[in-house]
Amino acid sequence: MTTVPDLESDSFHVDWYRTYAELRETAPVTPVRFLGQDAWLVTGYDEAKAALSDLRLSSDPKKKYPGVEVEFPAYLGFPEDVRNYFATNMGTSDPPTHTRLRKLVSQEFTVRRVEAMRPRVEQITAELLDEVGDSGVVDIVDRFAHPLPIKVICELLGVDEKYRGEFGRWSSEILVMDPERAEQRGQAAREVVNFILDLVERRRTEPGDDLLSALIRVQDDDDGRLSADELTSIALVLLLAGFEASVSLIGIGTYLLLTHPDQLALVRRDPSALPNAVEEILRYIAPPETTTRFAAEEVEIGGVAIPQYSTVLVANGAANRDPKQFPDPHRFDVTRDTRGHLSFGQGIHFCMGRPLAKLEGEVALRALFGRFPALSLGIDADDVVWRRSLLLRGIDHLPVRLDG
């Protein structure tokens, strides 16, 4: 009898890429267990790309099916009223709703707006590194990788920075899908929803030059305006997923460059190589490790029939290590052709936050390694603890020695 892999098991999280590779070689689309329910895991690159582009695999957890309870793992512990606020944005909707939302948001959340923030991101980065000091061992995630994206996203949305601690607490509960902490997870979700509801209302009456105020004002002759629920959901995604993805990128990037000194040397010799190094960091260890879909009808992916009403987990991180797409995929190589990696998704749901994440990653890593030429890990590489989350992989604590 074949054993169905359990994605919550200790053995999986000890070396998840090894498990992904074994599954991909035998069955790139395979049944698994996750959070006590049956699901299908997609680990092959071609199969993942096909799944992410197939609109029969729904992104919308609010859709109703006769006699079927739709369960998206990301909403573990969320009360239904709270879940709906998290599920009314571009990433959690299907066409035509998705088309309308993306069209409206893209009018204001533009590459130009993000690029205009570069001087401010560089300033915040320099200030944080000044506060870190110049010697000894510090937790670079706590002191740098975490506060930088929070400061940036707070300024982008017009949020008072005094709420930084709350964001950290909310996100730490929400990102880890632990059934034993479902109640606390649901409470954190409710608190952040209430905060955003209040923020949206304040921006309606006291608009500023921030992105949230701009999204409130945006209107289209055909598509109207964004509703209060839509604004709340979009702000939630930007605040939580937006800043946490960048935290993970900076933390993982620091770890990878310090544990691959030959690659760090390449970037130091040629600073123009850093943008591609960031792409390789994203490919090598994708922060958004899986993407959830729900089969609205039977779908064949990679020759495997996925039954109607099945939960499908597309493993972006596993697909990025498929040797059919990326030769010698387990080698970290900052000169690699990384085009086509799936860390930002695929198709109509390609992540709109990519320019901001890349900007923060490039600015942060350039400044960090420029400021501290002797930077080294403060603990053994094998002792680094990885977040046990298929929602967003990352490192919560990374001690580094500033002066070597």
Curated annotation (Swiss-Prot):
Q: In which pathway does it act?
A: Antibiotic biosynthesis; erythromycin biosynthesis
Q: Where does heme bind?
A: C351
One annotated Gene Ontology cellular component of this protein: cytoplasm
Disulfide links within the chain: none
| Record keyword Metal-binding present | yes
Keyword Amino-acid biosynthesis attached: no
- What EC designation does it have? 1.14.15.35
What does this chain do?
Catalyzes the conversion of 6-deoxyerythronolide B (6-DEB) to erythronolide B (EB) by the insertion of an oxygen at the 6S position of 6-DEB. Requires the participation of a ferredoxin and a ferredoxin reductase for the transfer of electrons from NADPH to the monooxygenase.
**Catalytic activity annotation:** 6-deoxyerythronolide B + 2 reduced [2Fe-2S]-[ferredoxin] + O2 + 2 H(+) = erythronolide B + 2 oxidized [2Fe-2S]-[ferredoxin] + H2O
Q: Which InterPro entries match?
A: Cyt_P450 (IPR001128), Cyt_P450_B (IPR002397), Cyt_P450_CS (IPR017972), Cyt_P450_sf (IPR036396)
Q: What happens when the gene is disrupted?
A: Gene disruption leads to the accumulation of 6-deoxyerythromycin A, an antibiotic with increased stability at low pH.
Which organism does this record belong to?
Saccharopolyspora erythraea (strain ATCC 11635 / DSM 40517 / JCM 4748 / NBRC 13426 / NCIMB 8594 / NRRL 2338)
Drop me one GO molecular function for this one: monooxygenase activity
Q: What is this protein called?
A: 6-deoxyerythronolide B hydroxylase
The text of the family note is: Belongs to the cytochrome P450 family.
Q: Where in the cell is it found?
A: Cytoplasm
CDD domains, A to Z: CYP107-like
SUPFAM superfamilies attached here? Cytochrome P450
Q: What else is known?
A: The bound substrate forms no direct hydrogen bonds with the protein.
Gene3D superfamilies assigned: Cytochrome P450 (1.10.630.10)
**Which cofactors must be present for this protein to function?**
heme
User: What GO biological process terms does the UniProt entry carry, in alphabetical order?
Assistant: erythromycin biosynthetic process
Where the protein is mainly located, per its record? Answer: cytoplasm
Keywords, in A-Z order: Antibiotic biosynthesis, Cytoplasm, Heme, Iron, Metal-binding, Monooxygenase, Oxidoreductase
